[in-house]
């Protein structure tokens, strides 16, 4: 098994059967070696730094019905909410006071949160906290909207 793990580390790929064998392995020495190699690869790729981000779930309302998602439109068990701009700004204020320097505004594709509203919210956050990074994850938008968000101060956009 050690040979298989070494090959995985060097080639970054195995065949299906080899993956199954690794997943089903119960040998303590093999699992220790696998854990060691995984930690080594993680440290080489990402280092030892940990980055803390202030994640603000601004809405769980969504027009989409993605089966993997807990906030999909058809899920009637979810109590829906949308934060006001004032609440979002207050969350950023509190986060800034606690030392957060990256804010992630995340939520479903809520038609009530227009591109203009998002752009204005980002601009207000950026003007108050110019030393902070702003990341958005609010579903699919137009290219023009992404550009407007960037001009307003958002530096990243996560698209799932």
What are these regions (language model features)?
Residues 9, 25, 91-92, 132:
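Generic recognition of cysteine residues
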Residues 1-64:
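Flexible, acidic/Gly-rich N-terminal and inter-domain linker regions that tether
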Residues 73-89, 95-116, 121-160:
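Core AdoMet radical
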Residues 19, 24, 71-74, 130:
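A broad detector of the eukaryotic-type serine/threonine protein kinase catalytic domain
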Residues 11-16, 65-69, 97-101, 121-123:
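Short amphipathic alpha-helical segments, especially helix-boundary/capping motifs
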Residues 44-97:
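Active-site cofactor/substrate anionic-group-binding motifs, chiefly glycine-
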């Amino acid at each position: 098994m050690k040979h298989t793990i070494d090959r995985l580390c060097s080639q970054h790929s195995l065949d299906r059967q080899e993956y199954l064998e690794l997943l089903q392995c119960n040998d303590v020495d093999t699992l220790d070696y696998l854990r060691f190699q995984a930690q080594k690869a993680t440290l080489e790729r990402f280092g030892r730094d940990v980055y803390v981000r202030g994640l603000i779930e601004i809405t769980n309302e969504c027009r989409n019905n993605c089966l993997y998602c807990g906030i999909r439109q058809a899920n009637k068990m979810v109590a829906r909410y949308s934060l006001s701009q004032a609440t979002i700004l207050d969350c950023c204020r509190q986060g800034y006071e606690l030392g957060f320097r990256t804010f992630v505004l995340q939520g479903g594709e809520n038609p009530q949160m227009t591109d203009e509203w998002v752009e204005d919210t980002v601009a207000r956050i950026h003007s108050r906290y110019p030393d902070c990074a702003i990341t958005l994850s609010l579903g699919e938008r137009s290219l023009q909207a992404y550009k407007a968000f960037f001009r307003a101060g958002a530096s990243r956009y996560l698209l799932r």
